[in-house]
A protein has these predicted regions:
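Thiamine diphosphate
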Residues: 1, 29-94
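Conserved thiamine diphosphate
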Residues: 1-30
Length: 94
């Protein structure tokens, strides 16, 4: 996957759930060049449950959760690892 991200002109999308998959698909249809959607075969839980008019995947990255206390780490994830990162964030706050 990393080598594909280095290819000039190739847009690589790695959505975390069905909502992001739909958003990435819409972005891929708008792109002039080639696009790749790296999908998981896992049954992933939705990571975004609130309706938003903006295509957040178009930003490239966005925040899913704010820290409830002073931040000591920043968790970054894509694709199926987003669910894992959200679980880690929850455990770190307890």
């Amino acid at each position: 996957l990393q080598s594909l991200r280095c290819m000039p002109g190739l847009h690589v999308y790695r959505p975390a759930d069905a909502v992001e998959t739909a958003e990435c698909w819409a972005l891929a249809l708008q792109d002039e060049g080639p696009s790749l959607l790296a999908l998981s075969r896992q049954n992933l839980k939705p990571v975004r449950t609130e309706a938003v008019a903006e295509n957040l995947c178009g930003r490239g990255a966005y925040r899913l959760r704010n820290a409830g206390a002073e931040r000591k780490v920043i968790l970054l994830a894509t694709g199926s690892e987003v669910e894992i990162a959200l679980g880690v964030a929850e455990k770190l706050e307890t």
